[in-house]
């Protein structure tokens, strides 16, 4: 016979029918009316014991986080939690701060202008405002009865205010360090390294370090070593870790190359002195043995021992995420090697096995190896001793190297090189939260070298917006892109050498898209409109990639871009008009990471980037090394206009996109 069904717990009802209900669950099998009656009694007793207060009163801290009912059901997971973006797509707002320690934090003194950098009122003023509002009983509310709050900035991208985690005193300290080393002559570099700077910067009349170089070079040379605590001083044998976080186009490559080469040459001098002392010692021992041999006629002669020399043992390893960066960093290292006298070996998967073998296992040896993590990790598996003498490991574009695709091979190289490693240097223009957390756990004592303009797009870069939905485009992004390029290159199109007009330099424009398939489509459309455009993506032929980037990186600006024989044929032009002296590359994020496009003045964002990280890297291809630049966003149907608006406002104020 079935008993009365209750609404308290259906699982308990099933257990009761089977006769297996535990004692702890027996109170849950009560009638629903009985449970409801007991809940009303408890609620009444609680209300009688607590004083009455306004229902909608909230503190400033809770006001910034409204209840879940106000947010709506949009963007919630099945478990009831808010859907959050992955940490690899969110910039970290505490890059300059080391991880929290168990020690009591030191009390920070009040700076003379410290109150100007505050983004929230002091707690005393907050309590005073709450007291006044409760006294007059006139809280500011909206029509629906909720308390009215000031809209937080950067709501669309979930950002925060500029330099919220970098106090005024920290920024003053960084600027003071930059003033101390405003010239390379003030840095204690070797004479050969000082002379090599002229070869690396031939186009600059006044060679002065950038903010990233002023902060990083002295620290990497050991001039500003941090005072280690008792906990860290007990650790012995670990490498000294550095994080160089600086904006795009700030000269990070030269910032880590100069101290590394200085350390390599000093180590060579020390080894040379030790070798001379050892040779003198061996000569003395040989003379003593020769004297003993004359007296002892039965002494046996010792055979000559030939010491095996393995040339594939570099002293420094530079890891980069792409083959294009291998060629770029290798070119900078080659320009320094003529004066400093060291051997650099840039290797990538685009090279043949014979070329890689000749680069690494050269009889003359190798000092610096520039490679991608997967290639070097595969070589280290077959030749484990290749990382046995590495003292400096540099991870350029660390946010990409410690992402899901490169992290296994990067960590494998780091583990193999740790026994002999002295310095670990991580460089990046963007520090996502996942990387910041990983470094805090793996290297808690890491020295963080952060410039004041981290995660900010330079103010010398202007951002314009083209609304594709309006006339005359009517939602056609291809037409809007072609028209924008024609407006940029119109001044160069008027150049006619027959009429004796002044020559206009060739304008180079980068067009960024989100999908790899769109590169070919957009490039074909631009070519049909008389624009010299090429597609650049991962599947592009390696020889064609080198020719395409040669003119845009400044390595070969005198020659024009020529299509390789394997390139697809250009379509028939829709009209006889062609845009002269203008070169365009349509690319994905492959062309936005680390490539030094010094000759690019204009960047067009065909698609709105997914994250602020992509915004920083794409717009960072222009306005490099103190030059001016311009970025143009094509805002089409379905794009986030609020995101573009907030990025534009942040760029106008010079704030960080965090």
From Swiss-Prot:
Cellular component per GO, a single term: mitochondrion
Region feature Disordered, mapped onto this chain: 25-150, 268-292, 552-573
Biased composition (Polar residues): 25-37, 552-562
Keyword field contains Nucleotide-binding: yes
Binding annotation for ATP: 246-253
GO molecular function: ATP binding; ATP hydrolysis activity; RNA binding; RNA helicase activity
Stretches that traverse the bilayer: none
Subcellular location: Mitochondrion
CDD domains assigned to the protein according to its UniProt record, in alphabetical order: DEADc_MRH4
Keywords: ATP-binding, Helicase, Hydrolase, Mitochondrion, Nucleotide-binding, RNA-binding, Transit peptide
EC number: 3.6.4.13
Cited SUPFAM superfamilies: P-loop containing nucleoside triphosphate hydrolases
Biased composition (Basic and acidic residues): 125-150, 279-292
Residue span, Helicase C-terminal domain: 490-658
Coarse class of the protein's main subcellular location: mitochondrion
SMART domains: DEXDc, HELICc
Top EC group: hydrolase
Function: ATP-binding RNA helicase involved in mitochondrial RNA metabolism. Required for maintenance of mitochondrial DNA.
Notes concerning its domains: The Q motif is unique to and characteristic of the DEAD box family of RNA helicases and controls ATP binding and hydrolysis.
Protein name in the entry: ATP-dependent RNA helicase MRH4, mitochondrial
